[in-house]
Amino acid sequence: MLEPLTIGLPARRIIGLIGHNGSGKSTLIKLLARQNPLSAGKISFDGKDLHEWGSRPFARKVAYLPQQAPDTAGMLVSELVALGRYPWHGALGRFGPEDKTRVEEAMRLTDVERYRARFIDTLSGGERQRVWLAMLVAQNPDCLLLDEPTSALDIAHQIDILTLIRRLVDERGLGAIVVLHDVNMAARFCDEILALHCGKLIARGGPEDIVAPDQLQAIYETRMGVMRHPDSGLPLAYPRS
């Protein structure tokens, strides 16, 4: 169960959702993406209740990537990216010049052009995430909702994917809400961090506000220390014995 909260999503900003397992992060983002029905209360987007949006008009505004991506066996990279245009022409609509332009631009922006003729299941985890992000970009939304996009990746690929998200947000003027487990990654890449605990928003602010010992203990229920990164000066959290 989630308690009421308000999230503004300005352009060119990334909001990170953090908290322990079961805190409500994925529940919240699924509600925002209309993947789960509301049991009470309401959610508004762009001045309208979510239930008032048609599926395709909503998908033209908001692109969602679940934690467990759908099966893509036997699908080429170019085919998956092209699916991002579905909200604009539907199942029976003609795939026109603008659709082709958007797909090519999306593959270029996410640097997956070289994989266009590859089967998705032959790619590494990081490469697959880039392709999924390319599909979202081809959708041409205003907002991205990303549920743990780095959870199955090693550190190098986590940084690679979050750097790409940061660049897409900055260059295309998108807003993004990203569920993350690593508070240090959130501090490095997010403009604002929302911390959930047992379905309740318990902290909200920039990295300096959230990555503080008392806040971290309240969020994760364990003692945490904080130091400064020697290069960036950003706060870094670490567990204390």
Where are these regions (language model features)?
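The feature captures the beta-strand-to-loop junction immediately N-terminal to the Walker
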Residues: I18-H20
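Helix-to-loop junction immediately C-terminal to a conserved catalytic motif
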Residues: A33
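Conserved ABC transporter NBD signature motif
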Residues: G41-D49, F58
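Conserved ABC ATPase "signature" region
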Residues: A82, P97-Y115, N140
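Conserved ABC ATPase signature
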Residues: R94, F119-L123, E127
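Catalytic Walker B motif of ABC-type/P-loop ATPase nucleotide-binding domains
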Residues: L144-E148
